[in-house]
Amino acid sequence: MLTIKNWQLLSENDKKLCLSRPRQSSAIKENVLEIINQVQLSGDKALYDLTKQFDRVNLQYLQVPQETIEQANIPQNALNAITQAIGTISSYHQSLLPENTEISTASGITIRNVYRPIQKVGLYVPGGNKTPLVSSLLMQAIPAKVAGCPIKVLCTPPDAEGEINEHILVAARLCGIDTIYAIGGAQAIAAMAYGTESVIKVDKIFGPGNSYVTQAKTLVAIDANGAAIDMPAGPSEVMILADTEANSEFIAADLLAQAEHGPDSQVILICDECELANQVNQQLEIQMSYLSRIEFIKQSLANSRIIICSNQSEQLDIINSYAPEHLIINRKNPESWVEKIVAAGTVFLGSWAAETMGDYVTGSNHVLPTNGFARNHSGLSTLDFMTRFTVQAINQEAICNLGPAAMALAELEGLDAHANAVQIRLNTLGD
């Protein structure tokens, strides 16, 4: 069960350790670099070889045939659920579409903001046949579609027969994606970043993954010849803030829902007193007994803990210091806490706000910053699939009025060619 820590009794160093996340092996970076180099050098051949090495599959093709996508079929109840999710996710991301605005900053000057969709985007969905992560696809494909990205490609690992789960194919089809590659892992990220004979090189890569995928995204993002990325999304995490009135059964269920993602996931409960902590631990044991991903859960809980802290100011400091991917405020008057939160990927309010709902059907995006990146990153949105540039119009009146100031600043910085570009125009107007 979860280790219980009394915050007031911890030293400053122990407090830091209490909020530390599982560390990634330094060997991963070297392994991923080797994979990226192999894809860059050998292209499609490397993808076939690496898939055989890591997935133990002899692929017959890299790109899923169009006929296979069109003929994919799933049970009606699954189709209904996907359709409902598409509706709410589309509504939310439509609301985020920006408007092209124009402002006059001075007489004779107008500046217009213009938004454009990124032309080529690559979506990554982890998991093979046993775990078709349809929701991960929807959370990327829908904002890409809403933004108007003309080229959308999907990479996802194949199953043992080299095929893609039909739930993924149907969801992709419903979201307007017809270019799908049966490739997973760091090699998929490398293929989309640099392109191969078969895989389209994209401008930006999206999607979560394991430590290899996250490392690959980080490496291609710092290479000028690679591709931009959405965010460095690592292992999933949740932090729950609960008072004495919170339902321990609900809390345990939310902790387990996050813990089952993988062995490096982390869950933290902050509560006022030991009684609730003990009740939650009891519930964890009860609920774990009938869950399927028990090995993942056990490893995750070993990285996790319960923090006893009765001081609300300190509770707030813990939250903002940790900057959780998911924050559940399961206590009285949860709304009153929101204005004090400065670092969180997404916040769930009240006892009925199961984090699972946000993962699938509320419409909000579940691709969120982890590992403390919520301090300076936001969850995925329509804007991430767009670029913005400004259009500046300057007439004669403006250059007469503001040109001398521009020249003075240019000369202050020792850039006389800058000053000259204005002076020549002023001279022309003076003739």
Swiss-Prot record:
GO terms for biological process: L-histidine biosynthetic process. It holds the Pfam family Histidinol_dh. NAD(+) binds at residues 124, 187, 210. Binds 1 zinc ion per subunit. Pathway: Amino-acid biosynthesis; L-histidine biosynthesis; L-histidine from 5-phospho-alpha-D-ribose 1-diphosphate: step 9/9. The active site is at 325 (proton acceptor), 326 (proton acceptor). Its EC number is 1.1.1.23. GO terms for molecular function: histidinol dehydrogenase activity; NAD binding; zinc ion binding. This is Histidinol dehydrogenase. The lineage of its organism: Bacteria, Pseudomonadati, Pseudomonadota, Gammaproteobacteria, Legionellales.
